[in-house]
Swiss-Prot record:
<keyword id="KW-0934">Plastid</keyword>
<keyword id="KW-0035">Amyloplast</keyword>
<keyword id="KW-0750">Starch biosynthesis</keyword>
<feature type="compositionally biased region" description="Low complexity">
    <location>
        <begin position="129"/>
        <end position="148"/>
    </location>
</feature>
<keyword id="KW-0328">Glycosyltransferase</keyword>
<dbReference type="GO" id="GO:0009011">
    <property type="term" value="F:alpha-1,4-glucan glucosyltransferase (ADP-glucose donor) activity"/>
</dbReference>
<dbReference type="InterPro" id="IPR013534">
    <property type="entry name" value="Starch_synth_cat_dom"/>
</dbReference>
<keyword id="KW-0150">Chloroplast</keyword>
<comment type="function">
    <text>Plays an important role during endosperm starch synthesis. Determines the type of amylopectin structure of starch grain. Synthesizes long B1 amylopectin chains by elongating short A and B1 chains, independently of the other soluble starch synthases. Barely active in japonica subspecies.</text>
</comment>
<feature type="compositionally biased region" description="Acidic residues">
    <location>
        <begin position="281"/>
        <end position="310"/>
    </location>
</feature>
<feature type="compositionally biased region" description="Basic and acidic residues">
    <location>
        <begin position="63"/>
        <end position="83"/>
    </location>
</feature>
<feature type="region of interest" description="Disordered">
    <location>
        <begin position="43"/>
        <end position="265"/>
    </location>
</feature>
<feature type="transit peptide" description="Chloroplast">
    <location>
        <begin position="1"/>
        <end position="16"/>
    </location>
</feature>
<dbReference type="GO" id="GO:0009507">
    <property type="term" value="C:chloroplast"/>
</dbReference>
<feature type="region of interest" description="Disordered">
    <location>
        <begin position="281"/>
        <end position="313"/>
    </location>
</feature>
<protein>
    <recommendedName>
        <fullName>Soluble starch synthase 2-3, chloroplastic/amyloplastic</fullName>
        <ecNumber>2.4.1.21</ecNumber>
    </recommendedName>
</protein>
<feature type="binding site">
    <location>
        <position position="333"/>
    </location>
    <ligand>
        <name>ADP-alpha-D-glucose</name>
    </ligand>
</feature>
């Protein structure tokens, strides 16, 4: 075939026609001479065939005409410049009315009819390097304002929008010199396209499609171009849906541009093809929209999104938190630990965390349901079966661990000998550390990622040890952390070293348990090992943390606390206002009691006092001060100090009510006081939640002579109920109480600096004198106490900071 093509190519003769006269043939005309038939490749038929080139047609001799040509994809650009091209490959225009030329075929080369007297540049170019100007012997006139306003200097076609042809190299030809009667036509060389464009299918006429150009200059001021102020009709989007093959080839992003066309482009801000719309879908822009409308719409949508999706209070710090404690209010409680385990998890849940509380199942709790999980754990050399019960209350998962060792101990949680207590706590900690894997709370277990255990006191101090020894040392639960909370360091889980094997730990862990006590000698200390293994440690008040570092307040663990001071934090407890709130307290809604607020303090609190006097069999007197004590009966709470001050108290015109359980000798003391001073003293042995609420509401004074108090909750409850505290200034009592100043009329109650009977008598005497003689000052104490924000929400925020520190600790 190559020889036939070469032979046929030699038959072409090229002659240049020249004329000296202006009206003669144009300079630079390329005239093709017909050649004999040759074996040529027929692209339309897809085969070789004998063909003769068509005879050349004379070009019209019009001096005022410009010619616009275009080529199909893949056509040689040199063939476009060849003379003798078909008329349907040209567009001729003059100053008169323009008519579209004839066309044999559709597709890319087809001329699309447009409005106006000046025909447009071809919509789809050949993809060549640049537009070519033929017959440009005379220099082109300076660009007009219309030409400057068109993007990339494209030939104006009755509109100022950006067309594909203006960026893809349409072939432009023009006459040598325009006629005098014809307005000058601006011919500007087009730059090479920045990115290729895949053309739509040629089976049907293509719709008009405008691709925004991000490199275009800013548009002229409004009114400078009359034609740009008249928007054209928007293309019919239905044509886009019909052509499934049309798409745009992605190119590099371009900077932001301002459109000069009144028709909005698809993407306004940046040339981001990831956001580019699909041609098969309707156009999102509507007629008449502009940039300002779109910006306003985006801004309003953003504001709505921010309002509707504010997110949790914890923000990106949302975590899975498991609180592990030996007691939890309202199911089982002997002191402040039960209140913390019942209230803190709810406050954390309100901040957006997923929270679980794990406690032993001491009795039959109606809210808890058996989840059907059975596990076996070894405690003190014995395999014991464990069942899991679950309840979901106030946004918190409560998981109860059921085992024979825990049953029927509702009223004696910490009872039994040392070996029995240790056996229960070993089983409890082993079962609790695997709860996030086994218990499907809400159908989805917590898992071991983004998880923090919050252990409380020595009863659960083995949990950080088991977490590290069983799992983290073996490559499991690597993203699980543990925080140990110190509520009372006086109870440490001490035992002989030879009982260490009962804990089922590796032998080298014995070094973490060994502790030498000058009094007791060498022993195994569970609390000490937990403090070492925990990622973070929290005390229930900053003052208590300071005391723990001293020899007197550290109870033998002060050296460990000093060594781990970097991970210590002091956070004061809060109040669960849904349970401890005089305005909604359910225990004040019967038997003559009444709910009250600051506004109704003067009328409703005396009603609670009278109801309490009647219920306990005391004389109903509004003028007599009613003193209350609520707490555990042991040496820490200082109830024996009250016993030493009893002769002075019995000589005053007062009434005294004591509620608590604990040491048997102290229980007998309460019963003896009631028998000796039956008209003034009542001793309630045991613990009653209802009676605790009613004493707090009905008493005028709450006395707390604790020898040490890590935080203390009863003084917080008392202030919230308008009851004035008299406390020993130690630990958390010092942090939460400020002494009354009669000259400045400030403070919340009375404090004394030593746990001695005469100091208690001195502070209590000042309190009673103020109650009897200075009613306005007394009411100021009540109002200031009730006006404080003592909720758990602030404490939960501080706990969250500690949890985040533990999370990112390695």
């Amino acid at each position: 075939m190559s020889s036939a093509v070469v032979a046929s190519s030699t038959t072409f003769l090229v002659a240049l026609a020249s004329s000296a006269s202006r009206g003669g043939p144009r300079r630079g005309r390329v005239v093709g001479v017909a050649a004999p038939p040759a074996l040529l490749y027929d692209g339309r038929a897809g085969r070789l065939a004998l063909r003769a080139p068509p005879p050349p047609r004379p070009r019209p001799r019009r001096r005022d005409a410009g010619v616009v040509r275009r080529a199909d994809d893949g056509e040689n650009e040199a063939a476009v410049e060849r003379a003798g091209e078909d008329d349907d490959e040209e567009e001729e225009f003059s100053s008169g009315a323009w008519q579209p030329p004839r066309s044999r075929r559709g597709g890319v080369g087809k001329v699309l009819k447009r409005r106006g007297t000046v025909p447009p540049v071809g919509r789809y170019g050949s993809g060549g390097d640049a537009a070519r100007v033929r017959g440009a012997a005379a220099p082109a006139p300076a660009p007009t304002q219309d030409a400057a306003s068109s993007k990339n200097g494209a030939l104006l076609s009755g509109r100022d929008d950006d067309t594909p042809a203006s960026r893809n190299g349409s072939v432009v030809t023009g006459a040598d010199k325009p006629a005098a009667a014809t307005p000058p036509v601006t011919i500007t060389k087009l730059p090479a396209p920045d990115s290729p464009v895949i053309l739509p299918s040629v089976d049907k006429p293509q719709p008009e499609f405008v691709i925004p150009d991000a490199t275009a200059p800013a548009p002229p001021p409004p009114g400078s171009n009359p034609r740009s102020s008249a928007p054209l009709p928007k293309p019919d989007n239905s044509e886009f849906a019909e052509d499934k093959s049309a798409k745009v080839v992605e190119s590099a992003p371009k900077p932001k541009a301002t459109r000069s066309s009144p028709i909005p482009a698809v993407e306004e801000e940046t040339w981001d093809f990831k956001k580019y719309f699909d041609l098969n879908e309707p156009d999102a822009a509507e007629d008449g929209d502009d940039d300002d409308d779109w910006a306003d719409s985006d801004a309003s949508d953003s504001e709505i999104d921010q309002d509707d999706d504010s997110g949790p209070l914890a923000g990106e710090n949302v975590m899975n938190v498991i609180v592990v404690a030996a007691e939890c209010s309202p199911w089982c409680k002997t002191g402040g630990l039960g209140d913390v385990a019942g209230a803190l998890p709810k406050a954390l849940a309100r901040r957006g965390h997923r929270v679980m509380v794990v406690v032993p199942r001491y009795g039959d709790y109606a809210e808890a349901q058996d989840v059907g999980i059975r596990k076996y754990y070894k405690a003190a050399g014995q395999d014991l079966e464990v069942k899991y019960f679950h309840a979901f209350i106030d946004g918190v998962d409560f998981v109860f661990i059921d085992a024979p060792l825990f049953r029927h101990r509702q009223d004696d949680i910490y009872g039994g000998n040392r070996q029995e207590i240790m056996k229960r706590m070993i089983l409890f900690c082993k079962a609790a550390v695997e709860v996030p894997w086994h218990v499907p709370c809400g159908g989805v277990p917590y898992g071991d990622g983004n998880l923090v255990f919050l252990a409380n006191d020595w009863h659960t101090a083995l949990l950080p040890v088991y977490l590290k020894a069983y799992y983290r040392d073996n490559g499991m639960m690597q993203y699980t952390r543990s925080v140990l909370v110190i509520h009372n360091i006086a109870y440490q889980g001490r035992g002989p070293v030879d009982e260490f094997p009962y804990m089922e730990l590796p032998e080298h862990y014995l070094d973490h348990f060994k502790l030498y006590d000058p009094v007791g000698g060498e022993h195994a200390n569970i609390f000490g090992a937990g403090l070492k293994m925990a990622d973070r440690v929290v005390t229930v008040s900053p003052g208590y943390l300071w005391e723990l570092k001293t020899t007197e307040g550290g109870w033998g663990l002060h050296d460990i606390i000093r060594e781990n001071d970097w991970k210590m934090n002091g956070i004061v407890n809060g109040i669960d206002y849904r349970e401890w709130n005089p305005e909604v307290d359910v225990h004040l809604q019967s038997d003559g009691y009444a709910n009250y607020t600051v506004a109704s303090l003067d009328s409703s609190k005396p009603r609670c006092k009278a109801a309490l006097q009647r219920e306990l069999g005391l004389e109903v007197r509004d003028d007599v001060p009613l003193i209350g004590f609520i707490g555990r009966l042991d040496g820490q709470k200082g109830v024996d100090i009250i016993g030493d001050a009893m002769p002075w108290i019995a000589g005053q015109d007062v009434q005294l009510v004591l509620l608590g359980s604990g040491r048997r000798d102290l229980e007998v003391m309460l019963q003896r006081f009631e028998a000796q001073h039956n008209s003034k003293v009542r001793g309630w042995v045991g613990f009653s939640v209802k009676m605790a609420h009613r004493i707090t509401a009905g008493a005028d004074v709450l006395v707390m002579p604790s020898r040490f108090e890590p935080c203390g909750l009863n003084q917080l409850y008392a202030m919230a109920y308008g009851t004035v505290p008299v406390v020993h200034a130690v630990g958390g009592l010092r942090d939460t109480m400020s002494a009354f100043d009669p000259f400045e009329d400030t403070g919340l109650g009375w404090t004394f600096d030593r746990a001695e009977p005469h100091k208690l008598i001195e502070a209590l005497g000042h309190c009673l004198e103020t109650y009897r003689k200075y009613k306005e000052s007394w009411r100021g104490l009540q109002v200031r106490g009730m006006s404080q924000d003592l909720s758990w929400d602030h404490a939960a925020e501080l706990y969250e900071e500690v949890l985040v520190k533990a999370k990112y600790q390695w």
